[in-house]
Amino acid sequence: MSDYKKTLQLPETKFPMKANLTQREPEMLRKWEKDDAYGAMVRASGQQGTYVLHDGPPYANGNIHMGHALNKILKDIIVKSRNLQGFKAEYVPGWDCHGLPIELKVEHELGEKKRTMPAHAVRKRCRQYAEKYLDIQRKEFKRLGVFGAWDKPYVTMHPSYEAATARELGNFAAKGGLVRSKKPIYWCCSCQTALAEAEVEYHDHTSPSVHVRFPLRDPRVAEVLPGVDPAHAYIVIWTTTPWTLPDNMAVAVHPDFDYVVVRHGGDFHIVAEGLLEACLKAFKWDEHEVVARIGGRALEGLKATHPFYDRPSPIVLADYVTLESGTGCVHTAPGHGREDYETGLRYGLDIYSPLTDEGRYLDCVEFFAGMTIFEANPKVIEKLREVGNLLAEGRITHSYPHCWRCKKPVIFRATTQWFIAMERNDLRQKALDAIRDDVRWIPSWGQERIHNMIEFRPDWCISRQRMWGVPIVALLCEDCGEAWNDADWMRDIAERFAKHATGCDYWYETDLSDIVPAGLRCPKCGGDHWKKETDILDVWFDSGTSFAAVVEQREECGFPADLYLEGSDQHRGWFHSSLLASIGTRGVPPYRSVLTHGYVVDGDGRKMSKSVGNVVAPQEIIDKHGAEVLRLWVASVDYREDIRISEEILNRLVDAYRRIRNTCRYLLGNISDLTPETMVPFEAMDPLDRFALDLASRAHERIQDAYTEYEFHKVFHTLHNLCVTDLSAFYLDILKDRLYSSAADSHARRSAQTALYRILMLMVRDMAPVLSFTAEEVFGYVPAALRPDVISVFALPATDAPAFTLDTTSRAAWEKLLAVRSETTKAIEPLRKSGEVGHSLDTHVTLFADPSLKATLEGLGSDLRAMFIVSRLEVMNLADAPADAWTSEELPELRVAVRKAEGEKCERCWIISADLGTDAAHPTLCPRCTAVLTGTGA
């Protein structure tokens, strides 16, 4: 017996079957660094224009987590795909370096020393801390295979950036949008600073619940409510913040609600009629009598008395009073609530909030001086009980605002702060118009979400009582407290920040005399004693002005950005602050499109938590599976919802990755001896090869469309389906005989090889944005003669949609052929089950078809037998089908007869033939294989 295996054209490639990603990826990173693959990618693009994805800066604190990995990989997929499509899309990564988390870490490190250190010394430590984690995170992001200008990132603590932020504040001042006033804002007593809306999280919290009566001793009560004795009249409120009662200034009722006077014992109590039953249940009053009804508007102006202080609490009107809970009469403390504050302004009430920064009552607060608000809660209740004005007491668990940093409950506290006024220059309406008209929101529900947030938000409190940030450039009169912040002067100071080695440290290191303009006098009192404002800017203003510091300034960018991409929480964060900052100073939004992704959760859909023990770190996955699997995970799911991750999910993706890799390896192995000179033009290819290339080209078009629409899960599924279904299970299975058994330089083999090469190059381009390491590795193993002369797969020039496509008529014919192939497989199955044949190659198939189908089948010529992977195939008229021929339910125009093929199996190609041994030198070979070996045929 001869060894005919050596005569076959078997696959040959050095591309390794085993990915060994954890070892190979670092090698690839070094290659990319050495070759400047990112620069090569950018230099090769630009034919389609520019595309700007502006990076939302992660906070320079700690190692990266799965949310960071998801976000950066998504951005990398977009940047790479846009460049490969011909857009010059450069990626400038950024870091958010100012703010409370870093300052608190440094505070902890410094301990008591911080109290005696000058501000610039503390800021230096904060800067060093941020630099440390910036470098750590940069390495971790690069390990993910993310391309970008890593050596030239934007950093919010860089002098040029700080100057831009201060300059934008000056621009707001110039337009009258910057104001300073005393208003209630979110305040964290633990961190001792104001908080923005975006810095507040809502969690369940258990609070005291009290019903309190306010004596109504106003003589006019008898006129408004005949029969009610003012000496025994009360109006009842309900609150979950007893500590705010010392600051009560009024009781609010709704002008359009009906109220009732309820007699219990000898006292009269006013509550809303719609809440009467709930109140009676809370008070545990079995016996009572409703003695009067009155509209809320009629109660306005009556003077109640504070429940434990000798001062009036007038009854006022407010539309925000509801009948959802309580009594319909609302305790009003203008120093501790936005709505209370607005009511206080309307009625001229005192905006009273006698608290220290750490939440302790000042000495002027009778009964509770020196107590924290939480210490005061039980003491207030005790006082109410003592004076006889506590009607009911309990506990309630409700959603309550907490500090995003320390996770402790926050309060509303009226303090003097700096604000961006939402109604000045029509900022709110302009922002709402831009949301509706000028921005594409992906997913679309993002539009309504941010619209509602902007529509109902208060003025933006931008001041913080901390050190680590951009200072609010303003002077305060030491004589009267008035602020001075001339816009031109503010912008001049900003330019000094830009020139200073450490940016806005200039504010802290420079003598006051060098900052105050000569001869400046207070416009309010005429004084000339000034001090610097010590508040810093909200970090959301800091990052929100990145469009001015980066998008407008960096030559590789352009305003407005094409895309902002962050987690869905940024509708209240960076998307929000960036929109207001840009609309406020430019009149237009800073972005054309906004794309959001969900949160990473565990395999059961639970939020990741250290306490639960379900946190998965990116580095763990990289160490076990490689970054490539993490990238594939990002592309495999619809990231616009919350994204699950687990070992089971990753293992499935490892299998999917292996199938894609093995397909690439097979394609590489079968083109090792192909050259540009031996390639076959598309028009001259065998029909099956043209169809396969058409399938791959259509998949390529779908993949490119999916990249354009940010639907990366469609990229993955299309690529995976191409490898598994169209190639491995169909085309490559059919092709093996032609590739292995045909003469090396035959048209049949070169046609197939050309198709495989074209398909491989489409696949490499399509997979590169997602499977970056593997695409580069595959590209490196493409035979040198066939590989484009570029240093990286990412430097491939953009091409139009490939012309390797069939017309609709040809496609329809192939769809019919595939259907016939499927039906034929069904017809063979009974013989396989019975053991009569072991493989489809053991069969002789006769297809009986009507004239139309018969013509389609015969049009494939010699490829037809190969396509069905049988040893012999005939096509005959449907009318000639024997009675026992298999009948197709799907194709009535087709019947199939299957029998065991006659003859012997060719030792070289394994096809059964009745004509073995036509050449005495090769007695076990079929005529085709004999012709190949003797050089007389293909």
UniProtKB/Swiss-Prot annotation:
It is an enzyme of class 6 (ligase). Catalyzes the attachment of isoleucine to tRNA(Ile). As IleRS can inadvertently accommodate and process structurally similar amino acids such as valine, to avoid such errors it has two additional distinct tRNA(Ile)-dependent editing activities. One activity is designated as 'pretransfer' editing and involves the hydrolysis of activated Val-AMP. The other activity is designated 'posttransfer' editing and involves deacylation of mischarged Val-tRNA(Ile). Its EC number is 6.1.1.5. It comes from Nitratidesulfovibrio vulgaris (strain DP4) (Desulfovibrio vulgaris). Its cofactor is Zn(2+). A motif ('HIGH' region) lies at residues 58-68. ATP binds at residue 610. It is found in: Cytoplasm. IleRS has two distinct active sites: one for aminoacylation and one for editing. The misactivated valine is translocated from the active site to the editing site, which sterically excludes the correctly activated isoleucine. The single editing site contains two valyl binding pockets, one specific for each substrate (Val-AMP or Val-tRNA(Ile)). Its main location: cytoplasm. This is Isoleucine--tRNA ligase. Monomer. L-isoleucyl-5'-AMP binds at residue 566. InterPro entries: aa-tRNA-synth_I_CS, aa-tRNA-synth_Ia, Anticodon_Ile_BEm, Ile-tRNA-ligase, Ile-tRNA-ligase_type1, Ile-tRNA_ligase, M/V/L/I-tRNA-synth_anticd-bd, Rossmann-like_a/b/a_fold. Binds 1 zinc ion per subunit. It holds the Pfam family tRNA-synt_1. One of its GO terms (biological process) is isoleucyl-tRNA aminoacylation. It catalyses: tRNA(Ile) + L-isoleucine + ATP = L-isoleucyl-tRNA(Ile) + AMP + diphosphate. A motif ('KMSKS' region) lies at residues 607-611. Zn(2+) binds at residues 906, 909, 926, 929. Belongs to the class-I aminoacyl-tRNA synthetase family. IleS type 1 subfamily. GO terms for molecular function: aminoacyl-tRNA deacylase activity; ATP binding; isoleucine-tRNA ligase activity; tRNA binding; zinc ion binding. GO terms for cellular component: cytosol. Keywords: Aminoacyl-tRNA synthetase, ATP-binding, Cytoplasm, Ligase, Metal-binding, Nucleotide-binding, Protein biosynthesis, Zinc.
